[in-house]
A protein has these predicted regions:
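Solvent-exposed, charged helical/coil patches
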Residues: 2-31
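Enriched for short, Lys/Arg-rich terminal
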Residues: 3-4, 12, 23, 38, ...
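A short, surface-exposed loop/turn module that caps and links secondary-structure elements
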Residues: 28-55
């Protein structure tokens, strides 16, 4: 089991999503991640991974695992902002 922690940037992104069904799907995926079942995830570099949520525009959650039990949710976005979001996630990870 993992301790899931969130950055303020991630919390703000998630709470500002207009699509409540998308919010619920993302929260569900985060809960699964907490139980060690990340699903559709791929590394994007600098220790950051991208969790893909197949809903709407293709939501993405960027996270970094620290140690064996802590996962930090860095930021989120969708397929249309993927390159910018990956760059931002790496910046946040470097600041931690």
């Amino acid at each position: 089991m993992f301790d899931i922690q969130k950055t303020e940037e991630f919390d703000e992104w998630l709470s500002n999503l207009a699509d409540q069904k998308a919010q619920a799907k993302i929260v569900s995926r985060i809960e699964r991640l907490g139980f060690g079942n990340p699903g559709d995830v791929k590394p994007v570099g600098a220790g950051v991974s991208e969790m893909r949520v197949p809903h709407g525009p293709g939501y993405r959650v960027y996270f970094k695992q620290t140690g064996k039990t802590v996962v930090l949710l860095l930021c989120g976005g969708d397929k249309s902002t993927q390159e910018k979001d990956i760059k931002r996630a790496k910046e946040i990870a470097a600041e931690l």
